[in-house]
Amino acid sequence: MLIVVSPAKTLDYESPLVTSRFTQPELLDHSAELIGRARQLSPDQIASLMKISDKLAGLNAARFADWQPDFSPANARQALLAFKGDVYTGLAVEDFSEADLDFAQAHLRMLSGLYGVLRPLDLMMPYRLEMGIRLDNGRGKDLYQFWGDIITAHLNKALAAQGDEVLINLASDEYFKSVRPKALQGRIITPVFKDEKNGQFKIISFYAKKARGMMARHIIKHRLTKVEQLTGFNADGYYFVAEESDANTLMFKRAEN
C-alpha cells in the first residue's frame, strides 16, 4: 500500500527533529532544471504568478537564488518534518518512533511541484512552487507538462518495491492531477471526508485536509497494508459509511457537535 499526500505552503525549519536520519531526493536533476527556470523570474513576476505578497515573493526569489543540490542537515530538512500545513497537523509526526518513520519511508510519498515525489526522510531546501501554477518551461506550459510521466513512473517503482498495487490517494486534486491513472500500475483508492454543517454533509477543505493527514497517520501507526483495514478509521469522530462507498472511494463522515 502506497499513500500519496500533498505538500504544504507553510514550512518549519526550526522545531526539534524527531530523527537525525535522512535520505536524498531521487529527482533532483529535474528540480535543478525547474530552479533554473524559476531564477529567471523577478520578484514581481513571482508575486503575480503565485498570487502572493511582495514580501513573500522576495523571500521565494531568495530561496530560488540560494538553492543548490548538495543537501545536508545544515541547509535542508527531512520533508515530513519540514511541511507544516493542515495535512501535517493531522499526521502529527512529533511522536513518530524510528519504526514509524521506517514504515512511512516505505509507504508514504509527498507530491511536490519542485521535487516531484518526496519520501518522508528526503532532505529538501525550503521552496514554494505549487503544482498548479502556470510556469512555462522547457517541457511545456505548466508543471503538469514538465513532470509528464515522471511522477507516475516513480510511484510505479515504489509500488513494485513493496510488491503491492494499491495506491491510497490522500492528495488534493491539484496535486493528484500530476499522476496519470492510466499509466499507474495499481488500483487507486480515494478516501473522502465530509463534515456536517447545518444538517448537510459536505467536504470542508480545512477539515478534509486534516482528516487526510489523520488517515495517513492511522495507516502508519497501525501498519495497515490492506484496503479493508482503512474502514476502521474513527479518529476525531469520523465514521465509515459503507453505503456511500464503492470499489474506488471510501466515504467517511463526521456529525456536527
From Swiss-Prot:
Which family does this protein fall into? Belongs to the UPF0246 family.
Q: Please give the biological process terms from Gene Ontology that the record holds.
A: response to hydroperoxide
Lineage of this protein's species?
A: Bacteria, Pseudomonadati, Pseudomonadota, Gammaproteobacteria, Aeromonadales
Instruction: Tell me what this protein is called.
Output: UPF0246 protein AHA_3667
A single Pfam family it belongs to is H2O2_YaaD
Query: A GO CC term?
Result: cytosol
Q: Which organism is it from?
A: Aeromonas hydrophila subsp. hydrophila (strain ATCC 7966 / DSM 30187 / BCRC 13018 / CCUG 14551 / JCM 1027 / KCTC 2358 / NCIMB 9240 / NCTC 8049)
Q: Specify the superkingdom.
A: Bacteria
